[in-house]
Each structure stands twice: as structure tokens, then as C-alpha cells.
Amino acid sequence: MTELKNDRYLRALLRQPVDVTPVWMMRQAGRYLPEYKATRAQAGDFMSLCKNAELACEVTLQPLRRYPLDAAILFSDILTIPDAMGLGLYFEAGEGPRFTAPVTCKADVEKLPIPDPEGELGYVMNAVRTIRRELKGEVPLIGFSGSPWTLATYMVEGGSSKAFTVIKKMMYADPQALHLLLDKLAKSVTLYLNAQIKAGAQSVMIFDTWGGVLTGRDYQQFSLYYMHKIVDGLLRENDGRRVPVTLFTKGGGQWLEAMAETGCDALGLDWTTDIADARRRVGHKVALQGNMDPSMLYAPPARIEDEVATILAGFGQGEGHVFNLGHGIHQDVPPEHAGAFVEAVHRLSAQYHN
């Protein structure tokens, strides 16, 4: 087993005792940091940054040099799998991700390959191995993937969407085609995350960014069912240590009980969910991650500290809380405000761990 100097993040996910509440931030390696912008400029474009193991490692480590974070998260993108399937990922200035060859029908789905994690996606595994080497056991490394439903939204819509009419048309008019796509994606994500674990990821997270746009019944059928399949297929031990799994559905606060039934170790909460209520509902089964509104980081540090105190009090005494934002950090947040946030979590949380 590789020694970890700080394992409180992994311990909290497994609801084991910790000295203070661990904290990390979604998108902690990102555009709010001037050093990230410099490295990205050096890489040329976003996917070139993802595909260069040394540069992906550099941006993964940048926030850890600034802040005493309790975990590193692989610098990558959720759309690596659709890109490896041959959909032609590119980024439009101000528009976000787009695909040159979106999925439009069942025949398109049938043609899609299941990517080899050490082949087309080998650059991700190289980044994982490089980051693990450079972390030198300081903190654990989180691997991740998008959920099948969330990946499918981009693949069918051809990019980002506000109304999701194209994928919902497929869902209601040709559900068989969508299920075929989701099944293929579930197999791909399982292989991809297991390869990340074998390469050195010590915890994995599934981001279901768009599950919250579904009705309750559709969420169960088209999103949660496939995440459950992935959880069932994941390696749960590696290097002599349990590998915790976190599920995060943005807008999924009403479905926490169903999510906790998947066998995952933790649930991510967005900021619209009350953490005290979430703990009452599922805290006996899973750890909870979250859940400060990322926009709170625009506030003065004293106000950020008040919000941290409120969320810590909401979760209350005992184990099973990983502090985080309710979604990714915004790109124009002052870096010193992120620092105040991390410092406040550690300082104010000790009283909850006796």
C-alpha cells in the first residue's frame, strides 16, 4: 500500500474518524488561477492541455501549491469518452464544447466503438500516472467521468444545451436508441474509471451534470439505472486500500435515497439541497460532499467564513462530510477568497470531530 501523508478525504468518504473536515473544490485547477492561464496558453488549447501528461499534471498540482487542499483531482474533461468514440470534439469560443458528428439515430449509435482506456484514452492514464508520481503521497488523487446520461446529452445535442429538446425527442420518440447509447456509455465509463483506478486514482467520482433536467421517473430509467450499473462494475479495492465512489447529480437533491441505494460511498450535493436534511435522509448510508454555492466566493472573506460555519453546523457532529462547493468554482473568483474558504473549513470544523 502506498503511504498517504494526508488521507482524511478518503477516510471521510468511508465515514471514518478525521481530525478536521476535508475540503477540495470542483474545478480547483482552473481559470481563476493566473498560473493555470499561463500553462493553458503554453499548451495552445484546452484539449492539448488535457492530452499532455506533464502539463495536465502541472495544472492539477497548481491549486495544491496555493492551498492546503485534502485531495487532488485529475485535470481532464468529461467529454474525453465521446471524443475517443470519434465524434470530433472541438471548442467554439464563447460557445463551449461542440461535436462535428453528433449522434442522430440508432444507426449512429450502433457504429460507435467502446474506446480502449489504454489506447485512444491512454493520454488520460498517462496523466494519472504522472500526477500520482508527482504527488509523492501528499494527498489522494481523484479520478472522474461524466455519467452516461450527461455524456449522451452532449453527444445527441451536438454540444451544450439549455432546453435539451434534441435528446428528449430521442428519449420519448426512440427510447430504444437512447438506451442503446446509454448502455454503450455505461460500459465505456466502467472501463475508463477502472483504468484510472489501476493507473493510480485513489477515489472516483461520476458527474451527472444534467440529470436534474429529467422527471423523477426518467431520472431513474435514463440516468440512475446506468450509474448503478457502473458502480456495480467498478474496482472497489486497489493497492490494499478501498477506492471510494462518489455520485453527483446536479439538481438531484430530491432523489438522494435512490442514489444512496446504488452502493456508492458518497453523494455530492449542489447548493440547493439543505445538508442537514440530506444527512437525516441518507447519512446512515453514505458520506456527503458539498455544498456551498460557488458564487459565495465573490463575497468578502468574513461572509465566506459565516457560510462555511453554517454548512458545518448543518451537517453537525461526526464523520462522513467532505466540504466542497455545490458545483465548479467560477473563473473570475479572486484566488485569495478560495484560500479563505479552505482555511475556514479546516479551522472551524475541528470542533465537530471529537
From Swiss-Prot:
- The UniProt record gives the binding positions of substrate as 27-31, 77, 154, 209, 327
Q: Which domain of life is it from?
A: Bacteria
Mind telling me which residues the site (Transition state stabilizer) is annotated on? 77
CDD domains named among the record's database cross-references: URO-D (cd00717)
**A Gene Ontology biological process term:** protoporphyrinogen IX biosynthetic process from glutamate
Family matches, as SUPFAM superfamilies: UROD/MetE-like
Q: Where are the membrane-spanning stretches?
A: none
Cellular compartments per GO CC: cytosol
Asked if the Swiss-Prot or TrEMBL record annotates the protein with the keyword Cytoplasm, the reply is: yes
Q: Where is the signal peptide?
A: none
Q: What EC number(s) does this enzyme carry?
A: 4.1.1.37
Identify the metabolic or biological route this protein is part of.
Porphyrin-containing compound metabolism; protoporphyrin-IX biosynthesis; coproporphyrinogen-III from 5-aminolevulinate: step 4/4
Question: Where does this protein reside within or beyond the cell?
Answer: Cytoplasm
What is an example of a GO molecular function annotated in this UniProt entry? uroporphyrinogen decarboxylase activity
Q: Is the keyword Lyase assigned to this protein?
A: yes
Q: Which PROSITE patterns match?
A: UROD_1, UROD_2
Q: Which InterPro entries match?
A: UROD/MetE-like_sf (IPR038071), Uroporphyrinogen_deCO2ase_HemE (IPR006361), Uroporphyrinogen_deCOase (IPR000257)
Keyword set, alphabetical order: Cytoplasm, Decarboxylase, Lyase, Porphyrin biosynthesis
Q: Which top EC class is named for this enzyme in its record? A: lyase
- What is the catalytic activity of this protein? uroporphyrinogen III + 4 H(+) = coproporphyrinogen III + 4 CO2
Tell me which PANTHER family the record gives. METHYLTETRAHYDROFOLATE:HOMOCYSTEINE METHYLTRANSFERASE RELATED, UROPORPHYRINOGEN DECARBOXYLASE
The Swiss-Prot or TrEMBL record describes its family as follows:
Belongs to the uroporphyrinogen decarboxylase family.
**Subunit field text:** Homodimer.
Q: What role is this protein assigned?
A: Catalyzes the decarboxylation of four acetate groups of uroporphyrinogen-III to yield coproporphyrinogen-III.
Q: Which NCBIfam families match?
A: hemE
What's the protein called, per UniProt? Uroporphyrinogen decarboxylase
Source lineage: Bacteria, Pseudomonadati, Pseudomonadota, Gammaproteobacteria, Enterobacterales
What would be the name of the gene that encodes this protein?
hemE
